[in-house]
UniProtKB/Swiss-Prot annotation:
Residues that bear Phosphothreonine: 312, 319, 415
Localization of this protein: Nucleus
Gene: MEF2A
Cited function: Transcriptional activator which binds specifically to the MEF2 element, 5'-YTA[AT](4)TAR-3', found in numerous muscle-specific genes. Also involved in the activation of numerous growth factor- and stress-induced genes. Mediates cellular functions not only in skeletal and cardiac muscle development, but also in neuronal differentiation and survival. Plays diverse roles in the control of cell growth, survival and apoptosis via p38 MAPK signaling in muscle-specific and/or growth factor-related transcription.
Swiss-Prot/TrEMBL domain comment: The beta domain, missing in a number of isoforms, is required for enhancement of transcriptional activity.
Protein name: Myocyte-specific enhancer factor 2A
Polar residues: compositionally biased ranges: 209-245, 390-402
Length: 507
């Protein structure tokens, strides 16, 4: 692509003609200089413009060149404009023809600038388009339940995800690498019969954990999801979140309860894990006898391997991707863990009841605090060694600001059932662990508090619903989990504690 050619005719515009003359005169002198140097010759240029102004150029000395010219008498080449035009026509340069048909193929500097700008904008658009699918949606929230109580339940998680992989950082201590299985092989392993299945969600699906032995009921419809995670925007009843409410209130499900008293059967490989979903907000789970509880505790202890370095408990982790709702996500500082560490006696007081929908633990080793990146989703308690068979529920659901549709009857303006929040004593003053006591049916007066799980009395999360029921929290710290326990056996046998255990019985 060369310079745009113009028609060689007289320029009518005076100003344009003057500019062209100046530029081309300098170009001509430049060419004369190059020729004189390259070919070792003498050149003299004599130019008169349209106004008879003289411009001359000589490679050495004009008088010397002119003297040599006047004294030269031999035949020589002499050319005029007509000779140049004829020479150009013979060489088919067509210098006199108008090159208008070629203008569409010639790029001027201005046109090249436009093309470069268009190319840069297109490259930026393509680059942003490629990056956009990898970003998690800002208004999209996922709820993930991670059961890792036996070697067969350890699922594979994408290391590139900052949501779940930090909570399973301790899983690298497991010796058997064959416990890891890709989530694609376990997406559709356990689905309730006779119900349609929802396809896997597309938002950040690569980083979500797929639980191979968990059936998640969907409270918004009648389709259980077997892929291990549920879109919490479409299902108000999630495993481990009790109706997507971090206070543990029971939301009624529109779908009929599954057979067997609301128990969803797990896979035959883990008979000790069952997800218990209350049929409605006014129903309560049937009590378990002492023999059944002891049998389940024995199964939990026996199912955990002795040489296994870590048996990760079941934790419901929810993506805190709704910053516009004003929820406070606060990390649990290390000082909290040292001042209020869990002991065997504390867990014995908490043994036997969990939040409805949470999965009970098997053998639990030492916990460590996991800080989940910018979301500050760290409510895993880093305490001492936990006793075998101890039950502990940690609800970190912060996905939805529930402010409407309370289904349960009106509640008292106090902590549920009078179960006061107490700080656990130091480990040096902790009593010995006590076995769980069989509990009879709760008293009828506790029916008005049935909609609230005991996790509410444990100050489960930082939801804005019923915020006036508690004391005013500190502005700089919101404790996701405050574990309270009855101070002695008499308090644990009180009707309020009995109602709380019955309200959240998990097997």
């Amino acid at each position: 692509m060369g310079r745009k050619k113009i028609q060689i005719t007289r320029i009518m515009d005076e100003r344009n003609r003057q500019v062209t003359f100046t530029k081309r005169k300098f170009g001509l002198m430049k060419k004369a200089y190059e020729l004189s140097v390259l070919c070792d010759c003498e050149i003299a240029l004599i130019i008169f413009n349209s106004s008879n102004k003289l411009f001359q150029y000589a490679s050495t000395d004009m008088d010397k060149v002119l003297l040599k010219y006047t004294e030269y008498n031999e035949p020589h080449e002499s050319g005029t404009n007509s000779d140049i035009v004829e020479a150009l026509n013979k060489k088919e340069h067509r210098g006199c023809d108008s090159p208008d048909p070629d203008t569409s193929y010639v790029l001027t500097p201005h046109t090249e600038e436009k093309y470069k700008k268009i190319n840069e904008e297109f490259d930026n658009m393509m680059r942003n388009h490629k990056i956009a699918p990898g970003l998690p949606p800002q208004n999209f929230s996922m709820s993930v339940t991670v059961p890792v109580t036996s070697p067969n339940a350890l699922s594979y998680t994408n290391p590139g995800s900052s949501l779940v992989s930090p909570s399973l950082a301790a899983s690298s201590t497991l010796a058997d690498s064959s416990m890891l299985s890709p989530p694609q092989a376990t997406l559709h392993r356990n689905v309730s019969p006779g119900a349609p299945q929802r396809p896997p969600s597309t938002g950040s699906a690569g980083g979500m954990l797929s639980t191979s032995d968990l059936t998640v009921p969907n409270g918004a419809g009648s389709s259980p999801v077997g892929n291990g995670f549920v879109n919490s925007r479409a299902s108000p009843n999630l495993v481990g979140t009790t109706g997507a409410n971090s206070l543990g209130k029971v939301m009624p499900t529109e779908s009929p309860p599954p057979p067997g008293g609301g128990n969803l059967g797990m896979n035959s490989r883990k008979p000790d894990l069952r997800v218990v979903i209350p049929p409605s907000s006014k129903g309560m789970m049937p009590p378990l006898s002492e023999e059944e509880e002891l049998e389940l505790n024995t199964q939990r202890i026996s199912s955990s391997q002795a040489p296994q370095p870590l048996a990760t408990p079941v934790v419901s982790v929810t993506t805190p991707s709704l910053p516009q709702q004003g929820l406070v996500y606060s990390a649990m500082p290390t000082a909290y863990n040292t001042d209020y560490s869990l002991t065997s006696a504390d867990l014995s007081a908490l043994q036997g009841f969990n939040s409805p929908g949470m999965l009970s633990l098997g053998q639990v080793s030492a916990w460590q605090q996991h800080h989940l990146g910018q979301a500050a989703l760290s409510s895993l308690v880093a305490g001492g060694q936990l006793s075998q068979g101890s039950n502990l529920s940690i609800n970190t659901n912060q996905n939805i600001n529930i402010k409407s549709e309370p289904i349960s009857p009106p509640r008292d303006r106090m902590t549920p059932s009078g179960f006061q929040q107490q700080q656990p004593p130091p480990p040096s003053q902790a009593p010995q662990p006590q076995p769980p006591q069989p509990q009879p049916q709760p008293q009828p007066q506790a029916r008005q508090e049935m909609g609230r799980s005991p996790v509410d009395s444990l100050s489960s999360s930082s939801s804005s619903y019923d915020g006036s029921d508690r004391e005013d929290p500190r502005g700089d710290f919101h404790s996701p989990v405050v574990l309270g326990r009855p101070p002695n056996t008499e308090d644990r046998e009180s009707p309020s504690v009995k109602r709380m255990r019955m309200d959240a019985w998990v097997t």
